[in-house]
A protein has these predicted regions:
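Conserved protein kinase catalytic/activation segment
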Residues: 87, 173-186
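Short, solvent-exposed loop/turn segments at the edges of secondary structure
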Residues: 12-14, 35-37, 71-73, 106, ...
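Conserved NTP-binding catalytic cores of kinases and kinase-like/nucleotidyltransferase enzymes
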Residues: 1-50
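ATP-dependent phospho-/nucleotidyl transfer catalytic cores
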Residues: 30-34, 42-47, 51, 83, ...
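Conserved hydrophobic/aromatic pocket- or pore-lining residues that grip, position, or stack substrates
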Residues: 19, 82, 168
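A conserved alpha-helical element in kinase catalytic cores
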Residues: 46-68
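Short, well-structured beta-strand/strand-turn elements
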Residues: 65-79
Length: 186
């Protein structure tokens, strides 16, 4: 099964597509992952479509050894039912199930939060409180932030986004998660 993927890319000339896999280990070797993958994305770049289609994948490849979760990237020429659909980035779909598979944590023991600060699970309110506190108090201590975030991950994430001048950040395509019994988001 598959569907069109994304919030904005459905408006683009080249659509991003999400596929639900029946065989969970079908693409593990190609994606270079050591866990089962149940959803993949053939991703197009809405903002960079036509002139920067490889940038996200290039950055992900450079950053794969940092303290941030990345979606592995492989450019693929896409045909659906014999019709050419363009060049897409083959990526694992990052969601709670992917985190659960990757880190061998039961899905029900994870709290997630998306880039808008929302979560379907209880427990994200404290992160919202911290983000509000950071906005209102620029002199907040490192220790207060470190109680809520895994600092190596947070610092690497900030460096990557700032160094590569991501104009689609921090408001889009960001995903925080943590174990329910641990206070730090990753």
């Amino acid at each position: 099964d598959f569907r069109i993927h994304g919030y904005i890319t459905p408006l683009a000339p080249q659509k991003s597509l999400r596929f639900y896999l029946k065989e969970k280990n079908l693409l593990n070797q190609l994606l270079d992952v050591n866990h089962n993958v149940d959803k993949i994305i053939l991703r197009s770049s809405y903002s960079g479509w036509g002139n920067e289609i490889f940038v996200d994948g290039f950055i992900a490849t450079i950053c794969k050894n940092l303290n941030v979760d990345i979606m592995s990237y492989h450019p693929v020429i896409t045909y659906i039912n014999g019709e050419y659909w363009g060049i897409h980035g083959l990526r694992e779909r990052m969601d709670l199930k992917a985190i659960s598979n990757k880190y061998q944590i039961k899905k029900k023991k994870i709290i997630d939060a998306d880039d808008k600060g929302y979560s379907k699970k209880n427990g994200y309110g404290k992160l919202n409180e911290l983000l509000k506190l950071l906005k209102e108090n620029p002199n907040i201590s490192y220790q207060k932030v470190a109680k809520k975030f895994k600092m190596k991950s947070l610092i690497d994430w900030l460096i990557v986004e700032l160094f590569f001048q991501n104009t689609d950040w921090p408001c889009n395509n960001t995903f925080f998660w943590k174990k329910k019994k641990i206070s730090q988001f990753i």
